[in-house]
Structures are given as C-alpha cells and as structure tokens.
A protein has these predicted regions:
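A short, internal acetyl-CoA/4′-phosphopantetheine-binding micro-motif in the GNAT/acyltransferase core
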Residues: 81-88, 116-117
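Conserved acetyl-CoA pyrophosphate-binding loop and the N-cap/start of the following alpha-helix
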Residues: 87, 91-99
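Conserved beta-strand in the GNAT
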Residues: 56, 62-70, 77-82
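Conserved beta-strand-loop-alpha-helix junction that forms the acyl-donor binding cleft
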Residues: 114-123, 141-145
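A short beta-loop-alpha structural element at the N-terminal edge
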Residues: 9-23
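Conserved GNAT acetyl-CoA-binding A-motif
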Residues: 104-116
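A conserved beta-turn-beta hairpin within the catalytic core of GNAT-like acetyltransferases
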Residues: 70-79, 88, 134-135
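A short helix-loop-beta-strand connector motif used in the catalytic cores of GNAT acetyltransferases and
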Residues: 45-56, 77
C-alpha cells in the first residue's frame, strides 16, 4: 500500500528577491492592479521602507496569497490582499490577514485600516467576517504629478 506524500506546508514570510513576477501575476489575476499604479514600483517602494513589507503565503513553492502592509507610526494599512481564485474559501485570506495584523502588532501599531472599492461586496463580507467594521469616513485624493482624476 502506497502512502500519500504529506501536503506541502503553508508558509507566510516577507517577500524576497524571487517571486516578484508571480506576485504581480496573482494581483492581476485577482483584479487588483490598476493602469495608474505600477505594481512593480509599489513592490520596490514597499521593500525599501522599514515600516512596510509584503507578506507572501506559499503552498510548497506556489504563491497563493499576499498582503502589502505598512504603517505611519500610528495606524497600519493593508493593500493588495490577494488569494489565488482557485484556492479561495480555504482560510488563506484569513491567514494572510492574521499575519498582517501580527506584523503590525509587533511594530507597536494598535489599529489597522484598509480600503475596499464600494462595488466589491464579496470582499466587504469577508472583512466583516474577520472582525472589521465599516468606518464613517470620506476619502479624498489628489494626484500630485498633474495626472487626471482616476476612479
């Protein structure tokens, strides 16, 4: 009788030099990229800062989830939360968010915030299911390089 090989361990760790193209491909597959934001530039900027990182969840060697996390010394923010669409509903989103929260706790940050597009009701339900609540805020933005407004 042959025994099945054990499933590869899930790991969550900060992004390294490898896998950047795979991370961008995952973000694109999840619909997170926008024409006005270069994801490679976002990754490079995040990796340069001491107050930010990109957490990567791997199943064996495959990147299955990400979260870009950072803080301003007072509040934490999370962006680019992505889970491989073929692996959703298995706890990977919860795991990567737990890791992002822990990263901020270790930095002494007591509150984490995130932004969700108003039409993305599926992800709104996910965040509510893990303890986040909608805040009564209005977000203002302005391009400082003269670009036209973006949605």
């Amino acid at each position: 009788m042959a025994l099945a090989a054990p499933a590869p361990a899930l790991t969550i760790a900060p992004i390294g030099d490898g896998g950047i193209a795979d991370v961008i491909a995952l973000w694109q597959r999840c619909g997170l990229t926008r024409p006005w934001n270069d994801p490679a530039a976002d990754i490079a900027l995040t990796r340069r800062g001491a107050n930010s990182t990109i957490l990567i969840s791997r199943d064996g060697g495959a990147i299955i989830a990400t979260a870009m996390v950072g803080h301003d010394g007072h509040r934490g923010w999370v962006y680019y939360v992505a889970v491989d669409p073929d692996r959703r509903g298995k706890g990977h989103g919860r795991a990567i968010m737990n890791a992002a929260e822990e990263w901020l706790r270790q930095a002494g940050i007591a509150k984490m915030q995130l932004m969700v597009r108003s039409d993305n009701t599926r992800v709104q339900a996910f965040y509510e299911s893990i303890g986040y609540d909608e805040q009564e805020r209005i977000l203002y933005a302005k391009w400082l390089d003269g670009r036209e407004r973006t949605p």
